Structure formats: C-alpha cells, structure tokens
Curated annotation (Swiss-Prot):
Designated name of the protein: G-protein coupled receptor 26
Native source species: Mus musculus
PANTHER family xrefs: G-PROTEIN COUPLED RECEPTOR (PTHR24245), G-PROTEIN COUPLED RECEPTOR 26 (PTHR24245:SF6)
GO CC, alphabetical: plasma membrane
Stretches of the chain found on the membrane's Extracellular side: 1-10, 69-81, 145-168, 267-276
Length: 337
C-alpha cells in the first residue's frame, strides 16, 4: 500500500468517524425532542440520517477494506448486497435532499398554508415515494446481474463485466444518474432559487424600513447607524450563503463521482484508480456533512443538544454527590458508636 492508498484509507476512516458521531447525535436529538418530531421535516431528516448511518456501517468499511487489500473485500453475496445498498442509499440520499428543499420552498413561499400543505401524512407519502423511486434501480440491476465489486472505485457498486452488455449498462447507468442526481439537482436549484427570491424581497422591505428609520432619527449615534447598516448587509448575505451551502455541498460531493462514472462508460481514456476511489470518498463525505448542513446548526437541534448535555452532566453531578454523601455517612457512623 503506497502513500496514496494510505491517504485514501485515512480519509475513509475520518469520514466513518465523523459520520457515526454526527448522524448518531442527530438521532439522539430526534429521540429527545418532541417538538422536532412533530414537524414534517423530521421525517425527511430521519430518512436521510438512517440512510447515512447504514452507508457508514456497511458500505464505507467494505470500501476501506477494498482500498487496503486491493481486491474484493467480501464474498459475492455480501458484495452484491452491499452494491444493492450503495445504489439504493445514494439515490435515497439525493431524493431526500430534494424533499427537504421542497419543504423549505413550501414553508417560505406559502407560509400561511404550510401546515395544510405539508402535514406528517404528506411527508410520509414523499418518503415512501423516495424509497420506491430509489429501490427501482438496484432491483433492476440485481435482476440483470449488474451488481458487484468495481476495482476502479474499490467498492461494491454497479458494474458489468460482460462486453456485450456495455451499451445496455451505459444506458441504465445514465438513466440512474439522470433520475437521481440530475433530477435532485434541478429540484434543488428550482426550490432554493424561489426561496432566495422571497428572502431578497423581504430583505428589501426591511431595508426600506431601516433606511426610513435612520433618516428620521437625526440624533442617532453613528455607531448605532453603522451597526444597523452592518446587520442590513449580513441579512442580505445570510440566505445566499445558506442556499450556496445546500447546493454547493451536493455538487462537490456527488458530481465528481457521477461524472467519473459517465466518463468511464462513454470514453476510452483511462481513469486513475486513485481518482476513482477519491470520487467515491467524496460521495461518502456527504453522509458526514449532512448532519451539519441540514440539522445540527439549526436552533432546535442546538437547543436539544444542550438539553442532552445538561441532563448527562446533572446525572454525573448527582451521582458524585451521592457517592460523597455515602462516604461521609460511613465516616460518621464509627464516631457515633
């Protein structure tokens, strides 16, 4: 194993560790907070988090073993199962992000009718469709024996070893990426650009009110005026930064792998194995970044984390106080005798 392989193995180990901790923390927040569970986005977050954890526990370790051993890390049946999960979880992750963007769009563009349009039942229906859509492709690949170990990515994933099936496999793979990656990307762009448009409209209204107030308040201190203008500037940039993060992480994590798969199918140019594994690692890194992008940085999840930490520390302090009380009573008893 050379330095490249060691670096890729280290990247995978780090991704596994961060993904387990962050997604596990999101699950704890969902279990702890009834307020979060009552909201429709909680179902999308739960679906995304469970998929990320399953990918972290099954697919990432097998890819790590493939990178270290430079060969298929498990038997054919286990590898086919892992390839089935890899295909399903990739599509499910992309479609779940599209569902979350639709929820944000409805919440921002139709705030008064949001509760009527996005109920828990509607969210459950969207999750069920996501599963059905995502299951279609691995089920078809399993029936056509297009699941196995792919040496270029050191992973159990979609692959075809028969040259006579190359065209059919290329069409199938293109359809899979078009109906998962491209479809989700189009939905993300449409919904978040609508959200950005509404956010900028509200910012303009607030800016007009702010400027009118500053004009009327002649005796206002210059430092207060500067703070108002700085807050106005931050308000303009806040929505743009968030939406850029949502779409940017999606592209950075998934686009290299999807493009590599398509270039592999439709080009005769050789692709380096290290780049293949790196593109797969980038796709895996989405599982580690999702909790921060969609959950843990939000106010409700931060509050739930604080409550969990307070509960843990309170239990420890009560336990230590109890132990101190027991030792104190043991020291007093012999004296009273």
């Amino acid at each position: 194993m050379n330095s490249w392989d060691a670096g890729l193995a280290g990247l995978l180990v780090g991704t596994i560790g961060v993904s387990l901790l962050s997604n596990g923390l999101v699950l704890l927040c969902l279990l702890h907070s009834a307020d979060i569970r009552r909201q429709a986005p909680a179902l999308f977050t739960l679906n995304l988090t469970c998929g990320n954890l399953l990918c972290t526990v099954v697919n990432m370790p097998l890819t790590l073993a493939g990178v270290v051993a430079q060969r298929q890390p498990a038997g054919d049946r286990l590898c086919r199962l892992a390839a089935f999960l890899d295909t399903f979880l990739a599509a499910n992750s992309m479609l779940s992000m599209a569902a979350l963007s639709i929820d944000r769009w409805v919440a921002v563009v139709f705030p008064l009718s949001y509760r009527a349009k996005m109920r828990l039942r509607d969210a459950a229906f969207m999750v069920a469709y996501t599963w059905l859509h995502a299951l279609t492709f691995p089920a078809t690949a399993l029936a056509l024996s297009w699941l196995g170990f792919h040496q270029l990515y050191a992973s159990c994933t979609l692959c075809s070893r028969r040259p006579d099936e190359r065209l059919r496999f290329a069409v199938f793979t293109s359809a899979f990426h078009a109906l998962s990656f491209l479809l989700s990307f189009i939905v993300l762009c449409f919904t978040y650009l609508k959200v950005l448009k509404v956010a900028r409209f509200h910012c303009k209204r607030i800016d007009v009110i702010t400027m009118q107030t500053l004009v009327l308040l002649v005796d206002i201190h210059p430092s207060v005026r500067e703070r108002c203008l700085e807050e106005q500037k931050r308000r303009r940039q806040r929505a743009t930064k968030k939406i850029s993060t949502f779409i940017g992480t999606f592209l950075v994590c998934f686009a290299p792998y999807v493009i590599t798969r398509l270039v592999e199918l439709f080009s005769t140019a050789p692709i380096g194995s290290h780049w293949g594994v790196l593109s797969k690692c980038l796709a895996y890194s989405k599982a580690a970044s999702d909790p921060f992008v969609y959950s843990l940085l939000r106010h409700q999840y931060r509050r739930s984390c604080k409550e969990l930490l307070n509960r843990i520390f309170n239990r420890r302090s009560l336990h230590s106080v109890g132990l101190t009380g027991d030792s104190h009573s043991q020291n007093i008893l012999p004296v009273s005798e």
